[in-house]
Amino acid sequence: MSIFTPVNNKTLTNIVVVRYKKGAAKFEIACYPSKVQSYRSKIEKDLNEVIQIHRIFTNVSKGIIAKKDELIKAFGTDNEQEIILLILEKGELQVSSKERDNQSEQTFKDIATIVAEKCVNTETQRPIPVSIIEKAMKDVHYSIHPTKSSKQQSLEVIKQISSVIPIQRAQMRLNITIPTKESKTLNRDKLMVLVSKIEEEDRDGGGLSIVCLVDPGSYRKIDELIKQETKGKGFIDIINLAVAKEGETKINETGKSAPTSTTTTTTTTTSSSK
């Protein structure tokens, strides 16, 4: 699509329009193809790579720019940057039905991949193939939300498909290191409430080192506790973001889990110090 606008006599080429309705009024922004979804998925963060022209239109195809009083009436402000961000986040992407179907299909696959990376089978603690996740999503009739990122939707999917397959968030493996002085005053009971399993514990040299498994939802609480208890001197290393046994789990027609040993589990490893 090529559109001529009166703004600096600029011709907009190869664009997609994001439209936001506010009552009877509608407002549009001109964006680069494929960049809107990348921005919503937190992949692209540079607005200049997403927005073709930093102006708000009432009709992009005709080059009609929204008036100041129209913006104030609809949004309570004429700050175009704020309004552009709102439209970009919550507006409806104007694409053809074929393009919409292709985007929806890709988002569907992206969500299933994220879920497979984050989760394990509840019964076997093994990874679940993406194909099984996709089938479960279809079984619960999951509908793609065009304005939500794949990551956001993956959390919704985990909850919904747990009704048809045994699935849970994979646990994280952490290495908590606390210096000698601080380890003596550590409130161990508070820490143990947040830890699922201690795999190793070492007091060599006077300090304390604990390798443990934790639920992802407990990570932030553990991080805050260690900071508080050690006055910022403790460290948390993330050994594995998702811990799973080797091999994948097959789900048969009866819903039972049948582990295989043909695939080796891959987990993402990162490290952070607090």
Swiss-Prot record:
Keywords: Cytoplasm, Cytoskeleton, Nucleus, Ribosome biogenesis. Residues 260-274 have a biased composition (Low complexity). Its main location: cytoplasm. InterPro entries: Ribosome_mat_SBDS_N_sf, Sdo1/SBDS, Sdo1/SBDS-like, SDO1/SBDS_C, SDO1/SBDS_central, Sdo1/SBDS_central_sf, SDO1/SBDS_N. It comes from the Eukaryota. It is found in: Cytoplasm; Nucleus, Nucleolus; Nucleus, Nucleoplasm; Cytoplasm, Cytoskeleton, Spindle. This is Ribosome maturation protein SBDS. The lineage of its organism: Eukaryota, Amoebozoa, Evosea, Eumycetozoa, Dictyostelia.
